[in-house]
UniProtKB/Swiss-Prot annotation:
Top-level taxonomy: Bacteria, Bacillati, Actinomycetota, Actinomycetes, Mycobacteriales
Taxonomic superkingdom: Bacteria
GO biological process, one term: translation
GO cellular component, one term: ribosome
Entries under HAMAP family matching the protein: Ribosomal_uS10
Designated name of the protein: Small ribosomal subunit protein uS10
Pfam families associated with the record: Ribosomal_S10 (PF00338)
Keyword tRNA processing: no
Keywords from the named record: Ribonucleoprotein, Ribosomal protein
Length: 101
């Protein structure tokens, strides 16, 4: 697998969970002998929702809620079969979305 690259994108609402998952991936990959670039923090996506406070009146009074999606990027250079096997066995929280390319 020389000259190849594995790109891992992580997404989560909780920044602590995504940082812990990224650290776990980096430690696992470095133990197998592959080179790691990252984790690179990508821009945080922020969705703001405005909801009317009253059930039927006072449209000017609104409450704002936001959801932040934190993203990280990890590149694995020159992965070995041992690296790929270790990545398949790694256990990450359900709140972290993992996309491997």
């Amino acid at each position: 697998m020389a000259g190849q690259k594995i790109r891992i994108r992580l997404k989560a609402y909780d920044h602590e969970a995504i940082d812990a998952s990224a650290k776990k991936i980096v430690e696992t990959v470095t133990r197998t002998g592959a080179r790691v670039v990252g984790p690179v923090p990508l821009p945080t996506e922020k969705n703001v929702y405005a909801v009317i406070r009253s059930p039927h009146k006072y449209k000017d009074s609104r409450e704002h809620f936001e959801m932040r999606t934190h993203k990280r990027l990890i590149d694995i250079l020159d992965p070995t079969p041992k690296t790929v096997d270790a990545l398949m066995r790694i256990d990450l929280p359900a709140s972290v979305d993992v996309n491997i390319q």
